[in-house]
């Protein structure tokens, strides 16, 4: 089995004359932010923390906030490297979930964020689209399992998944970015359909 190489020194730097790493093209920036969201959503350490509500009842919101502060690094800095992203993720886990992640799993996530940025810089959205489709499938699987559990029905028909329309892919991806990366608090609805009361103010960085 081959081992994937992880470049701990990976970094990106703003082009000459620019003060940050934001993309001027809205689609480019939206795809990048979606990509960051998808990468962070697949981080096992954070996923476990959210599933077990280690950050309290608003654990899911905290995950989106962590995505936001990683995106903000690129909005505020001229140079962002894997070490900075890794450090940001680890501190956020301690501050928001009281969890000290010691398995080095934050580094591959950080490097993948850098890779996503480079892909978006080159207008290559294949990886972002792949991650988004994988996330959608994971959500469908979770929903199917919930339905089977609630109804107590062992019929495999409950796990049928609707066909995905490729023509709507771009539109759906554009719509999901504001939901996952938002600078303004939006209503948070739990799995049972109840709206959660969000805390006032922003958490510290």
From Swiss-Prot:
It comes from the Eukaryota. PANTHER family: PRE-RRNA-PROCESSING PROTEIN TSR2 HOMOLOG. GO terms for biological process: maturation of LSU-rRNA from tricistronic rRNA transcript (SSU-rRNA, 5.8S rRNA, LSU-rRNA); maturation of SSU-rRNA from tricistronic rRNA transcript (SSU-rRNA, 5.8S rRNA, LSU-rRNA). GO terms for cellular component: cytoplasm; nucleus. InterPro entries: Pre-rRNA_process_TSR2. Transmembrane segments: none annotated. Required for 20S pre-rRNA processing. GO terms for molecular function: ribosome binding. Keywords: Cytoplasm, Nucleus, rRNA processing. It is found in: Cytoplasm; Nucleus. Residues 144-205 are annotated as: Disordered. Interacts with RPS26A. Present with 13400 molecules/cell in log phase SD medium. Residues 152-177 have a biased composition (Acidic residues). This is Pre-rRNA-processing protein TSR2. Belongs to the TSR2 family. It holds the Pfam family WGG. The gene is TSR2.
């Amino acid at each position: 089995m081959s081992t994937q190489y992880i470049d701990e020194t990976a970094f990106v730097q703003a082009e000459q004359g620019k003060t940050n790493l934001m993309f001027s093209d809205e689609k480019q920036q939206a795809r990048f932010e979606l990509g960051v969201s998808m990468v962070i959503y697949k981080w096992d350490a954070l996923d476990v923390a959210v599933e077990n509500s280690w950050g309290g009842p608003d654990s899911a919101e905290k995950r989106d906030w962590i995505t936001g502060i990683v995106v903000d690094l690129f909005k505020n800095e001229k140079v962002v490297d894997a070490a900075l992203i890794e450090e940001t993720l680890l501190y956020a886990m301690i501050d928001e979930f009281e969890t000290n992640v010691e398995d080095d799993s934050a580094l591959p996530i950080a490097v993948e964020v850098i890779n996503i940025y480079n892909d978006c810089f080159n207008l290559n959205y294949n990886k972002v689209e792949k991650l988004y489709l994988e996330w959608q499938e994971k959500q469908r699987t979770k929903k199917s399992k919930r339905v089977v559990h609630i109804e107590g029905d062992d019929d495999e028909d409950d796990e049928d998944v609707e066909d995905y329309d490729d023509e709507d892919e771009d539109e759906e991806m554009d719509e999901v970015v504001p939901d996952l990366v938002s600078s303004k608090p939006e209503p948070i609805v739990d799995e049972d359909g109840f709206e959660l009361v969000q805390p006032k103010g922003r958490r510290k960085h």
